[in-house]
């Protein structure tokens, strides 16, 4: 008799655990969940970037497996063929997030308010900000999110004018595009938001030949954000911290 839910993403694990801890019976082995002591006794069904372990998932006898569209398609299709219910999710906007929370609340028969309380910084009335911003995710290429991405959606929610909002995404990632140095210099963003991965990352920006020609750099308007929360949703806590930080820009 199957009972619980196996979650293949850190965000859905966090949402399920917040709503109904006993419903969560399998989680991904992600760095962001390892920080959460209360999850340490829940079996992990994947490590790092390796695909989830199908045998292990089946052995947990879940009534539902929740994964991420684009990342877990193969796993979910396979489980579905084996007669296990699956749910494929995507969070490319604030609306996607709220519908996901409502959906999982219905599945667990719990009140979605429990989750939204952990996102209180995202529900404050955003102050008007007259700032043109550009988010840079990497130096080679100069990758930046448009309004079809989670990051773009959050910038809009906090009244920040994302200069790349309406630009066409490149390649498979509809929500991201490659910028040219010329474009960046011409558009003159007031603030540059740089994404933290490891230490090497920041120094790379300083080495770009055009870096010191940028208005935001001259005015020292550089804001460092974590990858989790702004680029990858990560967890409820990482989203809440990102909202808090965007409001303070």
PLM features per residue range, with description:
Residues 53-67, 84, 178-194:
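Proline-aspartate-enriched helix->loop->beta-strand connector
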Residues 36, 71, 76-103, 224:
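Flexible loop/hinge segments that line or gate small-molecule binding clefts
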Residues 4-69, 160-163:
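A short, structured surface patch at a secondary-structure boundary
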Residues 3-4, 8, 60, 95-112, ...:
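Structured C-terminal subdomain patch of bacterial secreted/periplasmic proteins
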Residues 45-55, 169-182:
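Short helix-initiation/N-cap motifs at beta->coil->alpha
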Residues 74, 90-105, 136-154, 200:
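Extracytoplasmic ligand-binding site segments that recognize negatively charged/polar headgroups
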Residues 28, 151-173, 194, 224-226:
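His/Asp/Glu-enriched short active-site or ligand-binding loop at hydrolase and phosphoryl-transfer sites
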Residues 3-19, 111-159:
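Basic- and aromatic-lined ligand-binding clefts that recognize polyanionic substrates
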């Amino acid at each position: 008799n199957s009972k619980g839910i196996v979650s293949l993403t850190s965000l859905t694990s966090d949402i399920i655990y917040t709503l109904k801890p006993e419903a969560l019976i399998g989680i991904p082995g992600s760095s962001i969940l390892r920080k959460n002591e209360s999850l340490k006794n829940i079996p992990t069904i994947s490590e790092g970037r390796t695909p989830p372990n199908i045998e292990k998932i089946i052995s947990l006898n879940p009534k539902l497996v929740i994964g991420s569209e684009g990342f877990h398609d193969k796993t979910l299709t396979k489980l579905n063929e084996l007669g296990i219910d699956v749910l494929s999710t995507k969070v490319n906007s604030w609306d996607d997030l709220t519908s996901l929370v409502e959906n999982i609340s219905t599945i667990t028969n719990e009140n979605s308010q429990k989750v939204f309380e952990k996102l209180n910084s995202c529900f404050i009335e955003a102050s008007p900000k007259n700032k043109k911003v550009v988010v840079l995710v990497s130096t080679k290429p100069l990758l930046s999110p448009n309004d079809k991405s989670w990051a773009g959606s959050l910038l809009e929610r906090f009244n920040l004018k994302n200069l790349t909002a309406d630009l066409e995404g490149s390649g498979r990632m509809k929500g991201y595009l490659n910028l040219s140095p010329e474009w960046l210099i011409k558009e003159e963003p007031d603030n540059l938001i740089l994404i933290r991965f490891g230490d090497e990352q920041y120094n790379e920006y300083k080495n770009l030949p055009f870096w010191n020609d940028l208005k935001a750099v001259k005015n020292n308007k550089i804001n460092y954000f974590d990858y989790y929360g702004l680029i990858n949703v990560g967890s409820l806590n990482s989203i809440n911290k990102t909202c808090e930080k965007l409001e303070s820009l």
